[in-house]
Amino acid sequence: MLIEANKLIKLYIDKEWKKNIVILDASWYLPNAKREPIKEFKNTHLPDALYFDIDQVSDTSSNLPHTIPTKNQFEFNMQKLGINNDSHVIIYSMDGIGTSPRAWWLFRLYKHKNVSVLNGGMKAWKAIN
């Protein structure tokens, strides 16, 4: 489930990594945090990372925020990110481990087998780079 930052660096060095690995920033904050994760993502993110928008990857027909998406909604959103069943998805968040477990759990809920969370998130990445 967890991948360490030093192992992720080794994957980046291997030129073949882009064939199967998709890196997602799943950062999200409560409204009172007064932080905008999409803006933060645009300013700084892991190389080649994509943004996993929990507001979009939820059941948009519900009146409640961040409800579990249907399987079709989840698959549609993952296909837009270029993710398929063969992808090894590595998820991180800006604040340590924060919100990345929620994204990991959604992948596991819908039977995606190869998904990991970057242990320590962006903080761990920056600590060794």
What kind of region is each of these model predictions?
Residues M1-N129:
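Cytosolic catalytic domains that perform sulfur/thiol-centered chemistry
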